Amino acid sequence: MLLPIAPEPFTAPTDRDMLPSERREFVRTHRTCVFGYRRRADGPAMSVVYYVPTDDDELLVSTMAGRGKAIAVARDPKVSLCVLDERWPFTYLQVYADAVVDDAPGLVVDVMLAVGGRMSGEPLGDDARPFVAAMAEQEQRVVIRCRPYSTFAQPPRHLHDNDQAEQLTHWVSGSVPWDAPDP
């Protein structure tokens, strides 16, 4: 089941690394990410997208079947999602996932409706479903289903002004399995 829009995004701690449960909550309560995938040549490709979390820990991304994201995932299922906090101080969380392309029409429309709600900040009504279904068919939309297996956190470390430089702290984060328990 698709999770509803979170009333309030999780705020990452600024004095320590995020716990595994906090990393999962960060992902579940935010809405945008940089979707990364391998290209045949050159460096990795990245796209800023809205994503929709599910109650069984998948992250769903809507795209067109002919776009690079879908083509690349069909070739190589390893992807990354750099989940972005849209508030100050900016935080991000890298999520590593295995992905598959799903073209089930009902899921495609559900995800497109959910993305529309995340973009506007309010869920779209059922009256939008026929329009979205027609658009999904015309654009040959698919869903990329991402199953996270690991995360890497980057703590927020920003200055509001230069006299805060002495208070700025740094620490080393690390990769943590997606389903890791809290210590």
PLM feature spans:
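Short acidic (Asp/Glu) patches
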Residues: 64-67, 76-80, 121-132
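Amphipathic alpha-helical interface surfaces
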Residues: 23, 69-72, 108-111
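Alpha-helix boundary recognition
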Residues: 27-28, 74-75, 136-137
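Charged, gly/pro-rich active-site loop segments
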Residues: 1-18, 91-183
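Short beta-strand segments
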Residues: 30-65, 73, 79-84, 92-95
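Short, surface-exposed beta-strand-loop junctions and turns on beta-sheet-rich folds
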Residues: 67-69, 88, 160-161
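A generic local structural motif
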Residues: 19-22, 46-48, 66-68, 130-132
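Mobile-element integrase/transposase regions
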Residues: 16-28
